[in-house]
A protein has these predicted regions:
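Short acidic-aromatic low-complexity motifs
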Residues: 3-6, 10-35
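A solvent-exposed, acidic/Ser-Thr-rich amphipathic alpha-helical stretch
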Residues: 6, 27-77
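Short beta-strand segments enriched in hydrophobic/aromatic residues
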Residues: 32, 91-93, 123
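Residue-level signal for well-ordered, solvent-exposed loop/turn and beta-edge residues enriched
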Residues: 37, 99, 115-117
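Short, surface-exposed coil-to-beta transition loops
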Residues: 72-73, 88, 101-107
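A short hydrophobic beta-strand element
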Residues: 82-91
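Short, cysteine-centered beta-strand-loop-beta hairpins and adjacent loop/turn segments enriched
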Residues: 93-102
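Short beta-strand edge/turn micro-motifs at domain boundaries
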Residues: 104-127
Length: 130
């Protein structure tokens, strides 16, 4: 087993997903490397908005929870191949103005030393539900 994959299992990714559903940024960040990168599904660049390092990434996740106070990722499925992996999910959330969102998406991961080094998010672009 490669050193970069050590301790990364489907259970590890489920624990990461559980931390997101609990909106527990401390637990979320414990799954990520100190030099982690989060590439959001939207943003000004071709790869979405990029956040680097524990502080920036944590703030980005906190912003998701502030934007969608009831954010939830359901029906997760996790896959690992070497130092890469991905999770599929259905995201639901309601903005403060009442706009509801329900979309499928996935996260592509790169692992390093048993943690998530890169979380690259993708999701469908669906019109808001009325």
């Amino acid at each position: 087993m490669a050193q970069s994959q050590k301790n990364v299992t489907e259970d590890f990714l489920q624990s990461f997903a559980d931390a997101f559903n609990a909106h527990d940024t401390k637990a979320i960040m414990s799954h990520m490397t100190d030099d982690c990168v989060f590439e959001a599904s939207a943003g000004p660049d071709v790869n979405g908005e990029k956040f680097t390092g524990q502080e920036q990434v944590k703030k980005a996740f906190e912003n998701v929870f502030a934007t969608f106070p009831d954010a939830h990722w359901s029906n997760p499925r996790h896959f690992i191949l070497g130092n890469r992996g991905f999770s599929e999910w259905i995201f639901t959330g309601t903005k403060l103005d009442g706009t509801k969102l329900e979309v499928t998406g996935c996260d592509l991961f790169t692992f390093k030393n048993g943690k998530i080094a890169i979380k690259n998010s993708y999701r469908k672009n669906r019109l808001p539900a009325k």
